[in-house]
Every structure is written in structure tokens, then in C-alpha cells.
Amino acid sequence: AHPEDGESAVVLLAKFICENGLLDADDSEIFRFLWEAFPDFYGSGLKAEYEDEISGRLTAVGSSLQLNDRVARLCIDMRCPITADLQEVEKIVRKVIEGYGWKICSFEGNPGYYRDNDGREVRRLTDICQEVYGRTFVPYCMGGGTYARKLPNAVGYGPGLPFQKKPIPSGHGKGHQPDECVCVENLLYAAEIYVKAILMLDEMLE
């Protein structure tokens, strides 16, 4: 959901190979695409720079590369703003990719999902967090996929707190990082918040 916090091994490898002339001309063209298509994490190399006020900028990263029988296969992970037209995004990206001699074998997209920050339920859920922690929280929209998109009238609601310092080195401890962990204190607060949230939502449904 936040590729800008790291570096793409695929892009670094492609750049090193191209700059040092380690491949013949044909193979070098394959890796030139991998380098030029992802100069940043915001789709500029794919001509897909989308952004909206609610969900921010589109992100795109070549997340995995396979080479089998001289055929290169690249998986591109894109997180689009909720207002973006996925068919339009596919059309633009396809044109750029085919211009490099590649082709799209599969394009799968999930429509964006969003609940208004000012909606009654979201406001009350936020209030409960603030009551338990004694500090201000602001709801936000992100590109990560959650189970919320699979359930009607649901929102992602969990104890991921960026302000908490964990007693481990930088680059460790967060989601999908080495030593991924959560503070025990967070789990206890989360249990209290979830109980209060369930009771609150139950009252709203009555």
C-alpha cells in the first residue's frame, strides 16, 4: 500500500544490468522497460499519473519478475484512486507496455471502496478511539486491500498506530516487514475499542 517507503529490487537490478552492458541488445531492451517504466512509484513511466483528493496518488510498482524459457513475466501492482476509471487506466498502461514490445496477459482490478469520513458510523467509531486513547484521530483512505471491501457497509478498523515506537531497529516491525509485531498494550486497547464499537453499532441498528 505504501511502496514509496522502500525500493524496488526489480528496478535496481534492471538499472544495474542496463548501465553495465551485461546483456545483448534484445535482452537489454527487456530490462530497459523495467527501468524506464518505474522511475518513481506513481505511474509516471506508465503515463498513469492519477490522483484525487480523497485517496491521493496512484501507485505502481513492478513487484515480481520471472524469467522462464527466455520469457519474462512481470507482475505490476497498482493502487488506483477511488475515482479513477479502471478501464481507462488499463487502456493507457497497455499502450505504453506494448510500445516496449511487451504485452498484458491479464489485467485484474477491484473497484475502489470508500465510506465518507463524515458519515455517522465513521464519526462514532473515531470518537471511540479518541475516548480510549485520549488523543485525536483522523480517518484516512489508503490503497491497501482489506476485508472491508468484501462486506457491505464495512470499514477497516484496526490498531495500527504509527506514533508508537517499537523497541526494534528501523525497517522492522511494521506490516510485511521483518519482525512484524504489535504492542501488547495495543491489543488490550483494541479489545476495549472493539467491545465499545460493537455495542455502539448494535444501538444504531435498533
Language model segments and positions:
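Midchain, well-structured core segments that form catalytic/ion-binding scaffolds
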Residues: A1-A84
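Conserved active-site and cofactor/substrate-binding residues in soluble primary-metabolism enzymes
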Residues: E4-K15, R57, A84, E88, ...
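Short intrinsically disordered coil segments
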Residues: D5-A9, V93, G171-G173
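Generic non-transmembrane alpha-helical segments
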Residues: L12-L23, I92-Y100, R120, R124-V132, ...
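Substrate-recognition/cap regions that form aromatic- and gly/pro-loop-enriched pockets
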Residues: L67, A72-G144
